[in-house]
Amino acid sequence: MSIQRLGYLGFEVADVRSWRTFATTRLGMMEASASETEATFRIDSRAWRLSVSRGPADDYLFAGFEVDSEQGLQEVKESLQAHGVTVKVEGGELIAKRGVLGLISCTDPFGNRVEIYYGATELFERPFASPTGVSGFQTGDQGLGHYVLSVADVDAALAFYTKALGFQLADVIDWTIGDGLSVTLYFLYCNGRHHSFAFAKLPGSKRLHHFMLQANGMDDVGLAYDKFDAERAVVMSLGRHTNDHMISFYGATPSGFAVEYGWGAREVTRHWSVVRYDRISIWGHKFQAPA
């Protein structure tokens, strides 16, 4: 048994208030809860999908991967333990905070916290309503979206996420960033979404490179682009990726890592073949210096 989807993400941020404004007015998320020290946000019928907690890191804090049942959670726990990973069965306080029925946690080879759960809270009686009028986000069986981490050892990352957690490799991109710097990106999937997680040995001090939201319509992306562009907060221009074919742009967040906002990604198929690419984009995705 492997995990089924990316369910939620948590970030440690220096300025919760800025994130509350950013998530609602730039990304079109719906605020679910908020205080001076933390906030959560919705993008669909789930009680929350994104959490920000006050702290100095301005970086990745945790990811939550979903399974469909208690049995599935037990099977993932056994798989992790079989691969030498220490697993913690979380208690009632954190279970209540996450709004799930069962929860385990561990760390990947680089100390990144990973949570696996089942039984998330649905709020069909309180429909998602974007404050900016976003038509909706592609979630459901594909989960939240994706995120990309910088790791020190790609072989160790590949072993942990594919063998212990059950991800499958979608493809690889050898990306020449510039000035002779080249990195290899690994893209992993666990459902129809082309990738829910990716990693590479990237330059820079942050663990989180970016996270991605997939909107239901291209106009949603264009309207979001205009908001970022007006604030000179576009990091990479509109473009279309070679591997998942998503049309997207990248914007700056209040914490220094990026958010990818896209539409139109293709899905993995039953007879998917792993391939490699020499470029990240068919067109576009030109670097821009945010203000």
Curated annotation (Swiss-Prot):
Its EC number is 1.13.11.-. It comes from the Bacteria. Coiled coil: none annotated. One of its GO terms (biological process) is toluene catabolic process. Gene3D superfamilies: 2,3-Dihydroxybiphenyl 1,2-Dioxygenase, domain 1. Residues 5-119, 143-264 form the VOC domain. It holds the Pfam family Glyoxalase. It is an enzyme of class 1 (oxidoreductase). SUPFAM superfamilies: Glyoxalase/Bleomycin resistance protein/Dihydroxybiphenyl dioxygenase. CDD domains: BphC1-RGP6_C_like, BphC1-RGP6_N_like. Keywords: Aromatic hydrocarbons catabolism, Dioxygenase, Iron, Metal-binding, Oxidoreductase, Repeat. The keyword Iron applies. One of its GO terms (molecular function) is dioxygenase activity. Pathway: Xenobiotic degradation; toluene degradation. The keyword Ion transport does not apply. It catalyses: 3-methylcatechol + O2 = 2-hydroxy-6-oxo-2,4-heptadienoate + H(+). Fe cation binds at residues 146, 210, 260. Its cofactor is Fe(2+). InterPro entries: DiOHbiphenyl_dOase, Glyas_Bleomycin-R_OHBP_Dase, Glyas_Fos-R_dOase_dom, VOC, Xdiol_ring_cleave_dOase_1/2. Belongs to the extradiol ring-cleavage dioxygenase family. Homooctamer. This is 3-methylcatechol 2,3-dioxygenase.
